[in-house]
Amino acid sequence: MDYKNLVAERIKENTELEVDLIEKLIEIPPKKEMGDYAFPCFQLAKTFRKAPNLIAEELKEKINKEGFEKVVTVGPYLNFFVDKTILIKDVLEKVLSEKEKYGSSKVGEGKNVVVEYSSPNIAKPFHIGHLFTTAIGNALYKILSFEGYNCIGINHLGDWGTQFGKLISAYRRWVDEEALEKDAIGELLRIYVKFHEEAEKDPELEKEARLNFKRLEEGSEEETELWNRFKDLSLKEFNKVYDMLGIKFDSLAGESFYSDKMDAVVQEIDDKGLLVDSNGAKVVMLDEYNMPPCMIKKSDGATIYATRDLAAAIYRKKTYDFHKCIYVVGTPQALHFKQVFTTLKLMGHDWADDCKHVGFGLVKLANKKLSTRNGDVVFLEDLLNQSVEETLKIINEKNPNLKNKEDVAKKLGIGAVVFTYLKNNRERDIVFDWKEILSFDGETGPYVEYSYARGKSILRKAGELTGEADYSKLSSKEEFELAKLLGGFNDAIMNAIDKLEPAIVTRYVIEVAKAFNKFYNAHGILNAEDNDVKLARVKLVEATCQVIKNALNLLGIDVVEEM
């Protein structure tokens, strides 16, 4: 039963307010002893021509209280206490019947959502900063899909630009083919850095690089072949990381894909009378929006990121007719996206309002002990491997006889890293600390995973229990609080969609794990006082495990059945 909706329906019966508005006004009281839901009566003061506290008193007398333990007033608020037995029964039966679908809905049915995320640069390291966009984007993709949206995940690869002219020059001069086969990204990075060092002494190199890129733009066979090789080698490396994370994309259309679509966009901007000359460059003036001009073409005639993003947005709208187009890109790019979306609006594309920038913070290291292959760049693959190794050490200390411990270490180690990236508000910076990330105490991935594994261990020991559960036997505070939390899973998901914030689901599953451990520590389960209590508690454990598994899956994290 949706108690929030029930509260809204009961209030609607006695007021002229619509259910949707009432649901938006309903609050969760700050203290549990004040009730489960609270409705503020301020909105009714004009209609009833009375003080809100008097309205609350009147409604309390009139309202149908079926399904609620009691309804009380707290000043101008009408507070509802749900019937605990009914809630527990409703929630557990729903979880156990819907299983892996519990928490899902069809709210997004028939709506396409484009999610652009990850988007590393070809021939550059896939470093620890890239996991922020990758983890957030993957979680949003999964969360939105779970609620019925048809998601299109796009890896907008950085595979075009003058840097490829430089890389071609560097490759022809300094590449070590053996090193390239062993560590493609490392070798491409080495020669790219060397190009910049040498170009400071010899400016002719820059001219040569520009000529290389011009040839590439014109489709020259030799330059195109090299560019494709850089791309293939890079994707081979990137896919190692994506495989570790269990991530697949629906499209790899990167910057190069839009190279033949930009002239039409520039022409459209010009036709609308928006293109202005600024010191030889072509820009769209955005003064009235308190923004600097959006550069469309540089003074040398080259297009830049904004032009490509405009072309990409227009292409995606035509191809996918999206309900929303989400860009998971760092917060420093906020101005860039405001300029792009505003330019789209000025071009007459009102759907620009459906384009959303999802920003995120930076990744910092608590210490410098993370080994690096090249200077201060920490490769993501190395980080994930190191996390798996550290986790395996912990397992060998705590449970050396665990079956499949390498597989468990892989799931736990990678999951712990992803969980860390998704734990807090996405715009907050992350301070990376192994001790905290891999801890089995506190608000960490391993703590939630351990709670799940503990529950699964209880279920294995309980075996097959027959008979129908009597949920009235679950009468304690800990049992009610846990069941009530399980009932709030869909609310957490919908809130995450509304705010485009996966951390809401992460925080939710942490709270479920905490509530489960409180219940576990307060009550005997397998040694309960009688079989009826035992069966009801085992069902509560089963439902808890299901919700933890569903929540972690939405975050892109695999569960471990035993540890």
UniProtKB/Swiss-Prot annotation:
Keywords: Aminoacyl-tRNA synthetase, ATP-binding, Cytoplasm, Ligase, Nucleotide-binding, Protein biosynthesis. It is found in: Cytoplasm. It is an enzyme of class 6 (ligase). Its main location: cytoplasm. Its EC number is 6.1.1.19. GO terms for biological process: arginyl-tRNA aminoacylation. It holds the Pfam family DALR_1. It catalyses: tRNA(Arg) + L-arginine + ATP = L-arginyl-tRNA(Arg) + AMP + diphosphate. GO terms for cellular component: cytoplasm. GO terms for molecular function: arginine-tRNA ligase activity; ATP binding. A motif ('HIGH' region) lies at residues 120-130. InterPro entries: aa-tRNA-synth_I_CS, Arg-tRNA-ligase, Arg-tRNA-synth_N, Arg-tRNA-synth_N_sf, ArgRS_core, DALR_anticod-bd, Rossmann-like_a/b/a_fold, tRNAsynth_Ia_anticodon-bd. HAMAP family: Arg_tRNA_synth. Monomer. Belongs to the class-I aminoacyl-tRNA synthetase family. This is Arginine--tRNA ligase. It comes from Clostridium botulinum (strain 657 / Type Ba4).
